[in-house]
């Protein structure tokens, strides 16, 4: 679920970052349109696409299990439910993407607003 995604982001980035990404660019937050503005926004675009491929459960509300290793920074998705594992994998890839692209985060894209994202969306 989205709360777990926020927790995972905080784990992987080793700081409280959820609100920095909630309304970032054209794709971070609820939904998305237009073209991703930078590598950070592309993490959200890919995450949205990943959620769009999940069938049989709701990525925004269904919870899953995962473990986080502080030693090596890895997230491992657990549980027996394949659909929930898919949600977890979408979140794991996005959280890792945010960490790996932290240097691209640009405050000018925080609270960017959909009015600035009017181009045609690219396909997943």
UniProtKB/Swiss-Prot annotation:
GO cellular component, one term: extracellular region
Keyword terms of this UniProt record: Calcium, Disulfide bond, Hemostasis impairing toxin, Hydrolase, Lipid degradation, Lipid metabolism, Metal-binding, Platelet aggregation inhibiting toxin, Secreted, Toxin
Residues that, per the record, bind Ca(2+): 27, 29, 31, 48
S-S bridge residues: 26-117, 28-44, 43-97, 49-124, 50-90, 57-83, 77-88
InterPro entries for this protein: PLipase_A2, PLipase_A2_Asp_AS, PLipase_A2_dom, PLipase_A2_dom_sf, PLipase_A2_His_AS
Domain of life: Eukaryota
Tissues expressing the protein: Expressed by the venom gland.
Enzyme Commission number(s) of this protein: 3.1.1.4
Cofactor note: Binds 1 Ca(2+) ion.
Cofactor: Ca(2+)
SUPFAM superfamilies linked: Phospholipase A2, PLA2
One Gene Ontology term of the molecular function aspect: toxin activity
Active site: 47, 89
Subcellular locations according to the entry: Secreted
A single BP term in Gene Ontology: lipid catabolic process
Reaction(s) this enzyme catalyzes, per UniProt: a 1,2-diacyl-sn-glycero-3-phosphocholine + H2O = a 1-acyl-sn-glycero-3-phosphocholine + a fatty acid + H(+)
Pfam families linked: Phospholip_A2_1
UniProt family annotation: Belongs to the phospholipase A2 family. Group II subfamily. D49 sub-subfamily.
PANTHER family recorded: PHOSPHOLIPASE A2 FAMILY MEMBER, PHOSPHOLIPASE A2, MEMBRANE ASSOCIATED
Entry function: Snake venom phospholipase A2 (PLA2) that inhibits collagen- and ADP-induced platelet aggregation. PLA2 catalyzes the calcium-dependent hydrolysis of the 2-acyl groups in 3-sn-phosphoglycerides.
Designated name of the protein: Acidic phospholipase A2
Organism annotation: Bothrops jararaca (Jararaca)
């Amino acid at each position: 679920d989205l709360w777990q995604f926020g927790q995972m982001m905080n784990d992987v980035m080793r700081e409280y970052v959820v609100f920095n990404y909630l309304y970032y660019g054209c794709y971070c937050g609820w939904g998305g349109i237009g073209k991703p503005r930078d590598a950070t926004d592309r993490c959200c675009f890919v995450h949205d696409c990943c959620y769009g491929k999940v069938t049989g459960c709701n990525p925004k509300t269904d919870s899953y299990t995962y473990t986080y290793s502080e030693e090596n920074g890895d997230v491992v998705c657990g549980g027996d439910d394949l659909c929930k594992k898919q949600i977890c994998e979408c979140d794991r890839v996005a959280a890792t993407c945010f960490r790996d692209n932290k240097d691209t985060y640009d405050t000018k894209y925080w609270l960017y607003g959909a009015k600035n994202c009017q181009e045609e969306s690219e396909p997943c």
